[in-house]
Amino acid sequence: MIVSALNISEDITVDVDSAEPITQRERDRDYLELKRRVTQAGLLDRQYIYYAWKIPSVIVMVAGSIVVMAMFSGVLWVQLLNAAFLALAFTNLGFLGHDAGHRQMFRKVRQNDWVLLGVGFLTGMTPSWWQDKHNTHHRAPNQMDVDGDIEVSLFAFTEEQALAMKGIGRLTVKHQAVLFYPLLMLTALSLLFGGIAYQIRKERMRYPIAEPVLVVAGLASYLAVIFILLGPWYGAAFIAVHRALGGIYMGSVFAPNHKGMPILEKEDEMDFLHQQVLTARDVQGSPLADFWYGGLNYQIEHHLFPNMPRNNLKSCQVIVRDFCAEKGIPYHETGVWQSHKEILGFLHEVSRPLRQKKA
């Protein structure tokens, strides 16, 4: 088995091949033991009280933004700040949809689906498309030709990808470390249009009638509210700022999860426990960080236990970190700024061949 050993910082190099051979049965037993400890701690139990206030609080954020639109419709600077606030609210709606998609909220699948459909209506996201894409990522994180999150037209995550780029993609990849954050402004639109394309192709949809109806109705409502309350010019400015900042926010949350961590070839085989831990990065938690990242700063724990309610991930981290130390499994956690430093350094290094002068 070959895993690309990438230097994600000066101190961290992951090389799985150097580890002592362990049988598949032993590795499966390791994960079952970890799951037993986590279950015994009650961390997989549903958190109904948490979501009973979390869901309404995010809806209040959206409603508050609409109120500000109505009350200060003629004040541009207020509306631009309001657009930034709505970007925060919409991303938090996305976090709720993410939780529901992983069945973290309720035991019954349909109840989680109701939340996911509601998020689809409010944000314009197509639930089935997102679940299909995201579940594939969870099954094989950072695995070439499998994980769609490392198959992006404007970025390269291996030197082979960089050298294979053509046209505008080659230009953006050549300077991808510099262009990374500006290009994140396209994230929200990419997610929106990716879902619409999925619907047009009529691919697998859990709710083939409800999803298109809710998404179209939601987008129509979004545009109507903004343009009726703000008018065409202020409305257009509001949407531009909302979508751009929403993209940067989402991208800044998603990127630290796996970017700059080891990448597996398609033919590589790795047990569940090792693949989920070695390809993910945790960002140190705090009340502010936990809110900002929607719990996804505990990415290793989330990948090991996707259906764990997000407010239990911090407690789970203690168990997982100790278990990895016990088993000699590299566990990577860093701060917010260091995580972005690692990402940019990784992107710069991967694209280096495109900047080298030909002999």
Descriptions of predicted regions:
Residues 7-10, 16, 260, 339, ...:
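Conserved catalytic cores of large enzyme domains
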Residues 7-25, 114-117, 163:
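Short, contiguous pre-domain boundary segments
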Residues 26-35, 60-67, 268-269, 273-287:
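Conserved oxyanion/phosphate-binding beta-strand-loop segments in alpha/beta enzyme cores
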Residues 37-48, 161-169:
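Cytosolic juxtamembrane amphipathic/interface segments immediately preceding
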Residues 46-93, 120-125, 174-191, 205-253:
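Alpha-helical bilayer-embedded segments of polytopic membrane proteins, i.e.
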Residues 13-37, 179-190:
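Short, charged cytosolic
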Residues 85-204, 265-354:
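Membrane-embedded catalytic scaffold of the fatty acid hydroxylase/desaturase
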Residues 185, 250-267:
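Transmembrane alpha-helix/helix-exit interface in multi-pass inner-membrane proteins
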